[in-house]
């Protein structure tokens, strides 16, 4: 008998509420301190367990990323191999998050795949075991698997649960694809921000060490940030290109969105300290 499709597994976006680069390691990775918070704007995935070991992905972004590079398929394959699960899955992705925008969409898709298939395949790995699989695929996948707003250190893998305010955000996605690798390789990137205690970081003004460099190289990011700063305290997330402004009320964010210039795209979303994925997992 054919298995039913398990629907509406969310893969939420994240924002880096601050991002400090503390140094570069001998292996080329950067030491950082950052604060992750989720927003209620998500890709959505559906899953169907199959008897065959084949992994099939259907996506409204078909052809953009080769199957061998697709984090969803790599995550599913890694879980198969780790657990020796003999079956497979058919996966449907409804891609809503901008690609390459600093919102973590690809990592979130991979995390949701690991969490959902661990449940649907009944492979019974712990959250920590899933996070270890995820870390091999991407440094920010573990925070999506754990599903709680977190202060992160190291290359982003050492997590401490925190509960920052949950404002409304207006997120603008400039028409620019910023290469994370190029940003971190740029000699002008600040790499010497002192490491600070979490209490100090949580109480001071929040900045993104990548922002000045990206704004100088990408006029679209500079324009979006300049516009948004007229309405609210605003910063870039990750290495960009997306920027976000903080509002205390949804109506304030929607009013600003209504004035968004026609050459920009944006959306309003709520900050969330508990990921929608955790809610979905606990309410199958």
Swiss-Prot record:
Transport is among the record's keywords: no
SUPFAM superfamilies xref list: GHMP Kinase, C-terminal domain, Ribosomal protein S5 domain 2-like
EC number: 2.7.1.148
Binding-site positions, ATP: 98-108
Gene Ontology molecular-function annotations: 4-(cytidine 5'-diphospho)-2-C-methyl-D-erythritol kinase activity; ATP binding
Keywords: ATP-binding, Isoprene biosynthesis, Kinase, Nucleotide-binding, Transferase
Pathway connected to this protein: Isoprenoid biosynthesis; isopentenyl diphosphate biosynthesis via DXP pathway; isopentenyl diphosphate from 1-deoxy-D-xylulose 5-phosphate: step 3/6
Enzyme class: transferase
Protein name (record): 4-diphosphocytidyl-2-C-methyl-D-erythritol kinase
Gene, per the UniProt record: ispE
């Amino acid at each position: 008998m054919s298995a039913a499709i398990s629907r509406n597994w969310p893969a939420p976006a994240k924002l880096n509420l601050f991002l400090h680069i503390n140094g570069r390691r001998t292996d080329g990775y950067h030491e950082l301190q950052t604060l992750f918070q989720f927003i209620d704007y998500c890709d959505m995935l559906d899953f169907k367990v199959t008897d065959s070991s084949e992994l099939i992905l259907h996506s409204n972004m078909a052809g953009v990323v080769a199957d061998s590079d697709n984090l969803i398929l790599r995550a599913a394959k890694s879980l198969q191999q780790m657990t020796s699960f003999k079956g497979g899955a058919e996966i449907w992705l409804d891609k809503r998050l901008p690609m390459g925008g600093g919102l973590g969409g690809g990592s979130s898709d991979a995390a949701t795949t690991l969490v959902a298939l661990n449940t649907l395949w009944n492979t019974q790995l712990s959250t920590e075991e899933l996070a270890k699989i995820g870390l091999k695929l991407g440094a920010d996948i573990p925070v999506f698997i754990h599903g709680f707003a977190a202060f992160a250190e190291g290359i982003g893998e050492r997590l401490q649960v925190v509960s920052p305010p949950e404002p409304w955000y207006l997120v603008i996605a400039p028409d620019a694809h910023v290469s994370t690798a190029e940003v971190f390789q740029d000699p002008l990137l600040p790499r010497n921000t002192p490491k600070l205690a979490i209490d100090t970081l949580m109480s001071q003004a929040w900045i993104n060490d990548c922002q000045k460099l990206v704004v100088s190289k990408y006029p679209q990011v500079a324009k979006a940030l300049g516009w948004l700063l007229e309405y609210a305290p605003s910063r870039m997330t990750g290495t960009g290109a997306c920027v976000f402004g903080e509002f205390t009320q949804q109506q304030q964010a929607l009013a600003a969105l209504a004035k968004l210039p026609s050459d920009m795209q944006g959306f309003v979303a709520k900050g969330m300290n508990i990921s929608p994925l955790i809610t979905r997992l606990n309410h199958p």
